[in-house]
């Protein structure tokens, strides 16, 4: 499982002109799932993200988690995170999980994040989405389970 995490001042995702998910501040997650991922991977990533200290304390040091600052999470599925661009000029997506499996694991992952005590908004799985955010910092990290 691969997640691109962005600390966000605000974020939203729109499908067909309608906002389907929106947060005032917190973390924007682009979530990629490979066919080898399991629920154990999803739980690991959810716990890691909820407790990752990437928000600044009063002295400007990254010392607080999204839980500590009472932020929210916008989670967006993105199979293209498993695109392999090493050969040719078109990405190969063979490492991305099949849609049925990926959707199940994506939903499970979001529930695991909620179990950590976070409010989670989502995009629409498999849809073409417009994602808008103000990246705070910018702070952008890649979190992987393997």
Curated annotation (Swiss-Prot):
Listed InterPro entries: Daa-tRNA_deacyls_DTD (IPR003732), DTD-like_sf (IPR023509)
Positions occupied by motif Gly-cisPro motif, important for rejection of L-amino acids: 137-138
The keyword tRNA processing belongs to this UniProt entry's keyword annotation: no
Keywords, sorted A to Z: Cytoplasm, Hydrolase, RNA-binding, tRNA-binding
UniProt entry tagged with the keyword Iron: no
GO molecular function: D-tyrosyl-tRNA(Tyr) deacylase activity; Gly-tRNA(Ala) deacylase activity; Ser(Gly)-tRNA(Ala) hydrolase activity; tRNA binding
One annotated Gene Ontology cellular component of this protein: cytoplasm
Localization in the cell: Cytoplasm
Enzyme type, top EC level: hydrolase
GO biological process: D-amino acid catabolic process
Pfam families associated with the record: Tyr_Deacylase (PF02580)
Enzyme nomenclature, EC number: 3.1.1.96
Cystines in this chain: none
Catalytic activity field: glycyl-tRNA(Ala) + H2O = tRNA(Ala) + glycine + H(+); a D-aminoacyl-tRNA + H2O = a tRNA + a D-alpha-amino acid + H(+)
Domain of life: Bacteria
Record remark on domains: A Gly-cisPro motif from one monomer fits into the active site of the other monomer to allow specific chiral rejection of L-amino acids.
NCBIfam families according to UniProt: D-aminoacyl-tRNA deacylase
Role summary: An aminoacyl-tRNA editing enzyme that deacylates mischarged D-aminoacyl-tRNAs. Also deacylates mischarged glycyl-tRNA(Ala), protecting cells against glycine mischarging by AlaRS. Acts via tRNA-based rather than protein-based catalysis; rejects L-amino acids rather than detecting D-amino acids in the active site. By recycling D-aminoacyl-tRNA to D-amino acids and free tRNA molecules, this enzyme counteracts the toxicity associated with the formation of D-aminoacyl-tRNA entities in vivo and helps enforce protein L-homochirality.
Assembly information from the UniProt record: Homodimer.
Sequence similarity: Belongs to the DTD family.
UniProt protein name: D-aminoacyl-tRNA deacylase
Organism of origin: Bacillus anthracis
